Design a protein with these regions (language model features):
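A short glycine-rich, Lys/Arg-flanked "PGG" loop and its adjoining helix->strand segment in the class I
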Residues: 70-85
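Conserved class I S-adenosyl-L-methionine
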Residues: 85-116
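Class I SAM-dependent methyltransferase SAM/SAH-binding core
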Residues: 1-48
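A short SAM/SAH-binding and catalytic strip from SAM-dependent methyltransferases
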Residues: 55-70
Length: 150
């Protein structure tokens, strides 16, 4: 799930990066994407990728806008190879009018627990949360990650 920037290190060698987003201009401007697709996951959570097609899925600051998170993460699980990783990152920054109500009512720990619940309910294992930046020197950054069972 991406936009004009993928937040992937420039020196990280990846065979293929497939992007998802809502804005064709932004996705087209992202140099890390080999290919991309536009889809409103709140309307249609079925991802246009084959079963067990990818090794990892990154969701960067988008989880707070999902109205059908269990369906979306079940799809993420479907497209991941067994043992593949899902990595969900978020901050305390968002568009409050677009974020789901529950997200806005929770603190960072509550949001991490919520994302972990989404992943567990969608068939992921080895779920863990990490505080990568505490927010003292800028925006906080939280990651919740899990592995596809199977």
């Amino acid at each position: 799930m991406s936009s004009w920037v993928s937040h992937l290190p420039a020196d990280l060698s990846i065979r293929e990066v497939i992007g998802h987003g809502m804005n064709a201009t932004e996705l087209d401007a992202n140099p890390r994407l080999d290919r991309w697709f536009i889809q409103n996951l709140n309307r249609d959570p079925v991802l246009p990728l084959s079963d067990a097609a990818v090794d990892a899925v990154l969701c960067c600051v988008g989880v707070q806008y999902l109205t059908r998170p269990l369906e979306v993460f079940a799809e993420v699980r479907r497209i991941l190879r067994p043992g593949g990783r899902v990595i969900v990152s978020f901050s305390n920054r968002c568009f409050p009018m677009k974020a789901v109500r529950l997200w806005s009512a929770l603190d960072e720990a509550g949001r991490a627990s919520l994302v972990a619940t989404y992943l567990e309910g969608s068939g992921f294992a080895s779920i863990a949360a990490y505080l990568l930046a505490d927010g003292k020197a800028g925006d906080p950054l939280v990651v919740v990650a899990g592995a596809a069972r199977g």
